[in-house]
Amino acid sequence: MTEKFQKSSKNIMKIKQKKICAALVVLAVAIILCGVTKWQQNQAEIAMEEAEMERMADVPPLYAGILAEIRQNEMVLLEENQEVLIAAAERAAHPENNVYTFLQGPKSWSEGRTWSGEWSNEYVKGNYFGSFGCGLCCMANIYCTYTDYTCSPWDMYEYARQVSGYSPTRKVGAIGWADMKVTLRKCGFDCSLHNKPESYEKFQEQIKNAKGAVVLVCSRDDDTYWENTGGHYVNISLYNEETDEVFLGDPGGPSRNREFIPLRYVYDALKTASQYQYMLVNDYREENNEWKQDGIDENWVEP
């Protein structure tokens, strides 16, 4: 009985082993067939890609050609306009380079300082231009900076005599606020006259929103920056919010001219004894420019 059971068990094991072997063979064959199929598919795809590449080799590369042509044209434009682009970049990096800041005095002219000119030696009713021309220099700075034209401070003197009530005397040669505003209006500028506000923040905001300003400073009000100055017109522009500074055009101070200074210095030194303390340059309109003077005839030291 036991022998029969053992033989039967061995037979069952053999049968199972045969079935397992058969299954393994089938699985192996399936794997091989799958691999062959995948390889065939890859080969077919490679063949299609090669055929497509051969076909495209005979076709003009339209889009690639267009891109290449565009890039070539861009390079040509860059080369042709290199100086213009460099100048534009320079203007963006250093906007103060576009601001005119004429000097009024004969000493600056005799020393050959940049921005000085022979107008300093013009003689009017007992006074040399160098002793009274700060306001006219400021006006010429505005005209040359914000228009496409140029003029000298002496040109501005002659025009102010024509279109406003400006009439210098032996005692007073400087131009007044009203005549300054009228003359610049004839040049196309919208300007407004102001008194020193009680709040520094209000002054800040006004300067920030204006193209620039002519301000009247006096060391009797504050001598932190200007010393021994009874009354002197200067230009300020290019207000910088981050530093709270402005670019200074000082016709009578060659060592101060073209410096960035704290706006607070200007506010503190505004001449309160004057009818007005500053004039804002708000806008320029070409169609309102009745003068259109262009060119400087006098000898001067250009930057």
PLM-predicted stretches and their roles:
Residues 126-135, 148, 172-176, 195, ...:
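Extracytoplasmic/periplasmic, Sec-exported soluble proteins
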